[in-house]
Amino acid sequence: MKFIVSTIALAILFAGRPALADEQEDMASLRALDQAYATEWIDGDADGVMSLFTEDATLVPHHGDAPIKGHKAIRNFWFNPDYAPTVVPEWRREAVEIFISGDMGVIRGRARLVWEYAGTRTTIPEGNYVMIAVRGDEGWRIRLLTWNDDPRKWLQEPVD
């Protein structure tokens, strides 16, 4: 009887181990996705940035701007060939919380962003973001991204 009770107790104890390992792996993958988003921008790789999004992704920009839906619209919003490219020399992101439910993950974080456009360098010293990612055949991809910041704290200066 002791053997049966011990066996059942061990089975219950170790039954959660693979799930815990899977969750830790998913959390690491979501952190990597979050960092890859900043890295692709810093590298100036439009295709790399876009590869992180699902085809039906939505951006919900700051300051109440209208949502931007779909891969084509997002690419046009950020990488319109009629405009000079935005250069991102610095983007620090810190995932503060990560939630996972099945094939959906949510990252809430804080960020510092510096970008250069049309001769001006803009620094956002602090801001928030929420990234919702879904797991598909190609791994985790961004399905929805929103961010906010306080424009009164933006620092702007000419680019040398």
What residues fall within each predicted segment?
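Positively charged n-region of N-terminal signal peptides that target proteins for export
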Residues: 1-5
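Bacterial N-terminal signal peptides
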Residues: 6-15
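Short, low-complexity N-terminal intrinsically disordered segments enriched in polar/charged residues
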Residues: 16-55, 154-160
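A solvent-exposed, acidic/Ser-Thr-rich amphipathic alpha-helical stretch
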Residues: 24-28, 46-100, 110, 123-124
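A short, structured loop/turn motif at beta-sheet edges
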Residues: 98-105, 133-139
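A short hydrophobic beta-strand element
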Residues: 103-113
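Short beta-strand edge/turn micro-motifs at domain boundaries
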Residues: 126-156
